[in-house]
Amino acid sequence: MTSVPPELAARAATALLAAVRLLPVAIASPFLGGPLVPPVVRVALAAGLGAVVATLRPAALPPDALTLAAGGARELALGIVLAFLVSAPVEAARAAGRLADTLRGATLAELHVAPIRQRESAAGDLLAQWVVVLAAWAGADRLVVAGLLGTFASAVPGAAFPAAAALGVSLRAASDLVASAFLIAAPAAGGVLAADLALALVARVAPQLGAVNAAQPARAALGLLALGAGAATAGGRLVQLVALAGRGVALVAGGAP
């Protein structure tokens, strides 16, 4: 029985570790797959890119089983952090849309997205897709992919997990996510509040008109119009966050916050 050549075993281990790093990103981020892509395609994409990385890395000694398992755990942790950073701008837009729908009283108007088996806010799904299109048009998605693949130059597969850098960059990304979501949803909140105040005033001055029930469609439309204004204002910021995500993953892999 012939044994596997050491060089082939080493490259296979490198390919496996690289694929483990990229798999969470392929699962979560629309820039490298995403939830709407079939699982088999996402796994194949991560495995294929991992094989490319293994062919470009210099040959090394094959690791033992314990070293390979520890390296896999570190790569999985790093991949989860990278997936969060890359997905943060899209999730900011989705959170803004869901918050705006909640403020407009449209919480029941949710869409069932069959491929990912979850319910999604109509405005949230629209804004998330809008950010992906804007990022692709501006070229920010290519910066993200280049940043992800560039992590293998600064942090070889199986290297130590940069906990301090990952924590710092992740906290900044989380704060940007919350700030961007509120920036987009704030005009919708203001529009809905103004409409509610106007309706309350009309109902108090002339209750016989029944304006509260009759004006509900206008109230919802005003909130949607304000949401569109907020999204148009913050669109550049979200695209900038997508581009910065490419820089963020490089900072995490490089170990410098």
Predicted feature residues:
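Hydrophobic alpha-helical segments and their helix-loop boundaries in membrane
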Residues: 1-257
